[in-house]
């Protein structure tokens, strides 16, 4: 049972997994989700998820953002890359994601949480300081866009 759950949630991988996120702005707000699964469970972050076999980064981002938020986007070029490596108490790698965040253009839709997102919404620069936001998301938004500075 544990082995099936571990494989289902991508725990204890044999190799790093590639994942994408999409940075989407609308009316001076950024689209964020509150994660419902590890890694970053409970934190607000750029929406995204795993790339499937045969899928481009752009198509993966468009699919994942639609699944997690109900918002349609048009993804473009990579703008930020980072690793998420989480180890268990014994030091064994529990998760290892290589995450590529892409710039994206809002197309249509209103945020509604889906897939593994607990919440999804547009967040203004003024309110981002009141949320528990993942460090990678804070770094990206502040350093690349001056958002929330």
Predicted features by range, described:
Residues 1-21, 92:
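Acidic, metal-coordinating catalytic segment for phosphate/diphosphate chemistry
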Residues 26, 34:
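A cytosolic small-molecule/anion-sensing beta-strand core signal
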Residues 46-79, 102:
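The catalytic Nudix box helix
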Residues 82-110:
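Active-site-adjacent beta-strand/loop module that shapes the phosphate/pyrophosphate-binding cleft
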Residues 38-44:
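A conserved beta-turn-beta hairpin within the catalytic core of GNAT-like acetyltransferases
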Residues 101-103, 112-143:
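NUDIX/MutT-family hydrolases
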């Amino acid at each position: 049972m544990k082995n099936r759950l571990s494989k289902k949630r991508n725990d204890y991988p044999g190799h790093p997994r590639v994942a994408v996120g999409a940075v989407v702005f609308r009316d001076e707000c950024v689209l964020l989700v509150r994660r419902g699964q590890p890694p970053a469970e409970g934190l607000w972050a750029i929406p995204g998820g795993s790339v499937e076999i045969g899928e481009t980064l752009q198509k993966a981002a468009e699919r994942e953002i639609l699944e997690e938020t109900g918002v349609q986007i048009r993804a473009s070029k990579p703008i930020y890359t980072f690793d998420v490596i989480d180890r268990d108490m014994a030091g064994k790698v529990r998760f290892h994601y290589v995450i590529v965040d892409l710039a994206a253009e809002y197309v249509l839709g209103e945020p509604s949480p889906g897939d593994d997102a607990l919440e999804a919404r547009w967040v203004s620069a003024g309110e981002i300081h009141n949320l528990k936001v993942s460090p990678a998301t804070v770094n990206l938004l502040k350093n690349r866009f001056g958002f929330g500075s």
